[in-house]
Swiss-Prot record:
Species, as recorded: Osphranter rufus (Red kangaroo)
Gene coding for it: LHB
Protein task: Promotes spermatogenesis and ovulation by stimulating the testes and ovaries to synthesize steroids.
GO CC terms, sorted: cytoplasm; extracellular space
Family in the record: Belongs to the glycoprotein hormones subunit beta family.
Name of this protein: Lutropin subunit beta
Residues in coiled coil: none
SMART domains per record: GHB
GO molecular function, one term: hormone activity
Transmembrane in keyword set: no
Keyword annotations: Disulfide bond, Glycoprotein, Hormone, Secreted, Signal
Annotated compartments: Secreted
Disulfide bond positions: 27-75, 41-90, 44-128, 52-106, 56-108, 111-118
Length: 138
């Protein structure tokens, strides 16, 4: 019984230090700079908004492939709102409005492609391919 409690305590202590580590921030709202552009508009706009980012616990089965794979959780929106910016200089007939999600709260869950990019971290952030303008959102 004593050994079981010791092992449990060590696991809890290790888990607590891992979770608090600055190298592995857990899933939470965080500020990020994004880029918005349209093929028809001459300017790319960069802006800062709140996204969900961070690590979620995951599990890999050790048993053979007889069991279905464990679902892998991603850091995704729990609650969100949508905001919009206007891309400047768009010609008549082109919709200049770019809408994007704003994280209000985050959680670890299945990826919802309707409002999340589930591709994982990128070597480079989304960059503008056109001249760009930085906007400050209120």
């Amino acid at each position: 019984r004593y050994q079981e409690l010791t092992v449990l305590l060590l696991l809890l202590l290790e888990g607590g230090s891992w979770g608090a580590s600055p190298l592995r921030p857990l899933c939470r709202p965080t500020n990020a700079t994004l880029a918005a552009e349209s093929d028809a508009c001459p300017v790319c706009v960069t802006f800062t908004t709140t996204i969900c980012a961070g690590y979620c616990p995951s599990m890999v089965r050790v048993l053979p492939a007889a069991l279905p794979p464990s679902p892998q959780l991603v850091c995704t929106y729990r609650e969100l709102s949508f905001s919009s910016i206007r891309l400047p200089g768009c010609p008549p007939g082109v919709d200049p409005i770019f809408s994007f999600p704003v994280a209000l709260s985050c959680s670890c869950g299945s990826c919802r492609l309707s409002h999340s990019d589930c591709g994982g971290p990128r070597a480079q952030p989304h960059l503008c391919t056109r001249p760009h303008l930085s906007l400050r959102l209120l």
